């Protein structure tokens, strides 16, 4: 059977063989991406153009080309999840240290005086720009291999405030880190978050009950986890 027979992520040792003709390679890549899972992908080929094409299209956290799929070496081989396989840093943790910050206090000094409609919210997300890929950096190769580390921006991040000033501050922080920010223009209704497309995360600095409703709505989404970010920038970190 083919890739579509895999209904969930399975940790081995399990070997699933799916044969295909060479002209079907594009369909195979699409089928793999459609599963939503993508922890590690391995490719064995001598064709440089095929390596380049597949590496750019496959949605996986780690890509091994012509090498053993072994555990990553911290500081040399970055290792992180993707999509339904998780997005945590795992063994790539040392590269995340400069993003750590202390959790701030809830900001209840601002609020929205109107509600942002679902139509306006959906339209704003659909027209948001796509995040840019940062230039590759190269890590030490213990056995002479090439270890490239790439970083990609999340899908658009919704800056929900509360209030115009808070939303603008959130958007500036997202943009400064290379992300794509979408500023709310009114109070977001929690139920609208469940089916909202192109959503990478939601930033909310307001009251706890609203944050709880946002959390529940995001948890009800299908596909990869979309985080609710309530921490505020800390100048001391």
Predicted features along the sequence, with ranges:
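Conserved C-terminal structural/oligomerization subdomain of aldehyde/semialdehyde dehydrogenase
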Residues: 1-237
